[in-house]
Amino acid sequence: FLLLSGCGVGYSVQRHHVDKLPEVRKPIKSRRYLIQDSIEGWADSIKVLLKAYFADRSLPLFDYRSIREKGARLIISGGKAPGAEPLKRCLNKIQTILDSKGDGDKLTPLESHDILCLIADAVLAGGIRRSALISLFSIADDEMMKCKTLYDGVIEDHLGEHDGVHNVRVSVWRDEKYCMTKEIFVPQSDYDELKENGKIQWFYFYPERARSNNSIVIARPLITKDLFETKWDVIKTSGSGEPGLYFTNNIELGSNPCCEISLNPYQFCNLTSINVSDVESQEDLNDRAQVAAFMGTLQASYTDFHYLRPQWKKQTEKEALLGVSLTGIASIDESKFDFAEAAQCAVEENEKVAKLVGVNPAKRITCIKPEGTGSLVLGTSSGIHAWHNEYYVRRLRVGKNEAIYKYLLDTIPEIIEDEVFGDGAVITIPVKAPLNAKTRTEDVEQFLNRVKFFTNSWVANGHQGGMNTHNVSATVSIKADEWGRVSTWLWDNQDSFNGLSFLPYDTGTYVQAPFEDITESDYQKFSSHIGNINLEDVFEDQDNTNLQGELACSGGACEI
């Protein structure tokens, strides 16, 4: 329900939480269940299936006839209806996991995690909005630790090749345990790695796992340096920078997918953003902080959460959280402004407006979001992150039924290509950073110290209560020779952040990454094409919006 409503979701599959789930009981009877064509109807179908294995043992025989056919208009959310197939595929795969368990067995954390990822995959395929998840798991959970790392693989059959893409049937193992055999398409580089070294990426076999960012829960009072360094080595060798790290003072607390908000179970936060790239004075910054806090406090009065259980309303109203964020930071000299003073202005405005509208003052007010989408609208750097480079490309995903796709394919085919792992297309836009802006080529400790500076000056001064503060959401790009230095910094400064994610500096193993470095000559070439775009020639006589998204928070570009 939350994902279909456009909300990112954080969840825990820590062992002590998953252990509280009931034992799986095989259904002993069946009944017809008609799925209603609504957000609530789709959510109810998941609930009914799970109850069949955990409670009433009455297996639903799903009837999809009420669901609008694929391509029908979605009046409220926009875009086109996906039809019943994404939901049917989701329910079948969840049932396969449940059927694999013996009567009286318990789900493992990884199985619980995969069920949630399958739900997110159905939402994504449904085109309602890109799904964002963060999965928090126990530090000793080896299955979760490795679920987005390389598999051992063997090519069983080579079925064909076209333009450097190989069609192969592959069997894979993890720790000498057979997992599955599947027919896949792989680009030349991954084919060579599989053929020569017997290694293949996880996303060919469990693509739904890309819907979640996974993070190890690290209890600050309990972690030892040796254990931390052991887990850091796994992150380093994963090739994708996963899992991330979530340092906490209380393992019962969690966060939103991009990790800037400290949340109790069953809790929402009210987010606003300040563009600091064009702030002219301290007074200007303070004024913006007040306005953002004013807007967030008004939002905090909206707590009529239909469909959800009463504890969501109770917990959200109790702390009335705000998330006043900053973006465009890499375009300014932060030492010229007093962010602690600005945070205090936000606190005072929240207290004043909360009293006027009859809500509780917020327990936590200031944070820094990734700002992937907001920065595009504003033309700024993203949150705490540097500009990607002096010259780079930004990739945007569109559906092939959208008017912009046909227009670009007919007029400027140089900037559009097919998705490698989807049926959409990718538009490539060139970007040039402003003069004297901070770029991703900066020293990694310079970036980490900027995270620390804003944690201490902005986030900490907006903290009014709770065992964890809010956070500076950050993805750390790490060069090959920097992993040791980053490990040392993280250990020495573990009180200066809650959650961080990591990517190898070369964008890791992600194909068609959201950002990619280019040369000045490439920029000039792409720019010459961009200059020929005339959006007045693009006509939309119906809404074909494709709301499917990218890897959440990838490369400092959270698309929520």
Go through each PLM region and give its residues.
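Function-dense linear segments that define catalytic or interfacial modules
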Residues: 1-87, 234-333, 555, 559
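Alpha/propeptide regions of enzymes that mature by internal proteolysis
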Residues: 34, 39-50, 85-122, 223, ...
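Secondary-structure capping and boundary motifs in well-ordered enzyme cores
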Residues: 38, 83-86, 111, 259-268, ...
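Flexible, glycine/charged-enriched surface loops at secondary-structure junctions
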Residues: 59-61, 101-114, 123-135, 302-317, ...
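Catalytic or ion-translocation cores adjacent to nucleophile or general acid/base/metal-coordination motifs
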Residues: 62-95, 381-413
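Internal maturation/activation junctions in enzymes
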Residues: 128-166, 199-222, 303-313, 321, ...
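Catalytic alpha/beta core of large soluble enzyme barrels
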Residues: 235-238, 244-308, 318, 370, ...
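Short acidic, low-complexity intrinsically disordered linear motifs used
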Residues: 545-560
